[in-house]
Amino acid sequence: MSIKIIIPSLGESVTEATIAKWYKKLGDAVKTDELLLEIETDKVTLEVNAPCNGTIGKISKTDGANVTVGEEVGEINEIADTDTAWINNKKQEVSQHTSEQLVDKPAMASNILAPSVQKLVTENKLDPNNIKGTGRGGRITKYDVLETINTTPITIETHAINKTNEERTQRVRMSRLRKTIAQRLKDSQNTAAILTTFNEIDMSKVIALRNQYKEEFEKKHTVKLGFMSFFVKATIEALKLIPSINAEIDGDDLLYKNYYDIGVAVGTEQGLVVPVIRDADKMSFADIEQAIGNLAKKAREGKLSISDLSGGTFSISNGGVYGSLLSTPIINPPQSGILGLHKTEERAVVIDGKIEIRPMMYIALSYDHRIIDGKEGVSFLVKIKNLIENPEKLLLNL
């Protein structure tokens, strides 16, 4: 009996993927849940495992092919559980044969790369034998290649001043992630009536509070106290005050969400991703800092799962970590708002009729004007400003 190998669900709003690499070939024996192939979406790399014991009877989509959810990419000739001894013997024969072939070719295994990984290696003129693989079975992943690139000294070559037009430009095909980012951002602008409102925050008190307790906080919770946990907490309180910003348009209806899954934008070598902190309103400051740290690490290593990226009721983007003074963030559909944070900079401000130097931050709220009125957008930022400038209110739930 033949069992189809089907592309599984890829998560919310993701319907297409690319086959990165098949790890089995026609006739290979496989066991239930054994790795068959890897597929790449615009967000993550996923493994497709064997649905049953048997042998590979058909491969209809090869490496590099584009596939969709539910599409058949091959078949397994099923073997009953009582025949697993035959599979084990078959695997042992293949393993022995492979070992004999590799006796005089120890570097061959490291050169078996997924197309996307091979492309990175080739473009950067790297030797795969010099890259330490951290993937399953020691295979080389995109993250391994990027780490090698980042740690390799740059050699600057001297060229003649006169160059041909071809040498002065370089054409590079957009990655699936970059194409998806471009499409989603353009769709957001074309669909939503985006409006941005601004405010500024005196960061003096929250900085003082953090400096006073950061060492004690880290010692107790084994995670550093940053400013993001304060902003996540303040954002949730502002969303409770203005429920429409935590809602979305669904056809002719407004869908109000009584939960708070906050997306936090993270920049990676591949592009921007927005992993989600689930039920952030139920978390402590330490829980939020831990969640942000874990998600950021997974994002940089390319190990985010579909569930890490799916959903989200509102997003926060902190351009301040890159030195941004002011920006107008773009909404992440189908959400209705996004908060933009920026760098803290000492500026002269008037306090009680006197000019003082204070650490100030500009904040921005981009929102969908179809569902959110201007008054609500302004009130949202004022609430956040009030809580950050008086952080004791966050601690006392005021």
UniProtKB/Swiss-Prot annotation:
Gene Ontology cellular component list: cytosol; oxoglutarate dehydrogenase complex
A GO molecular-function descriptor: dihydrolipoyllysine-residue succinyltransferase activity
Organism: Rickettsia typhi (strain ATCC VR-144 / Wilmington)
GO biological process, one term: L-lysine catabolic process to acetyl-CoA via saccharopine
Purpose: E2 component of the 2-oxoglutarate dehydrogenase (OGDH) complex which catalyzes the second step in the conversion of 2-oxoglutarate to succinyl-CoA and CO(2).
Superkingdom, natural source: Bacteria
EC id: 2.3.1.61
CDD domains in the record: lipoyl_domain
Gene3D superfamilies (UniProt xref): 2.40.50.100, Chloramphenicol acetyltransferase-like domain (3.30.559.10), E3-binding domain (4.10.320.10)
Pfam families with a match to the protein in the record: 2-oxoacid_dh, Biotin_lipoyl, E3_binding
Family: Belongs to the 2-oxoacid dehydrogenase family.
Limits of the Lipoyl-binding domain: 2-77
Residue ranges annotated for the Peripheral subunit-binding (PSBD) domain, each copy included: 112-149
GTP-binding keyword on record: no
Pathway(s) per entry: Amino-acid degradation; L-lysine degradation via saccharopine pathway; glutaryl-CoA from L-lysine: step 6/6
Keyword Transferase among record annotations: yes
N6-lipoyllysine, modified sites: 43
Top EC class for this record: transferase
Reactions mediated catalytically: N(6)-[(R)-dihydrolipoyl]-L-lysyl-[protein] + succinyl-CoA = N(6)-[(R)-S(8)-succinyldihydrolipoyl]-L-lysyl-[protein] + CoA
Active site (record annotation): 369, 373
Residue ranges of coiled coil: none
Record-given protein name: Dihydrolipoyllysine-residue succinyltransferase component of 2-oxoglutarate dehydrogenase complex
Cofactor(s) listed in the protein's UniProt record: (R)-lipoate
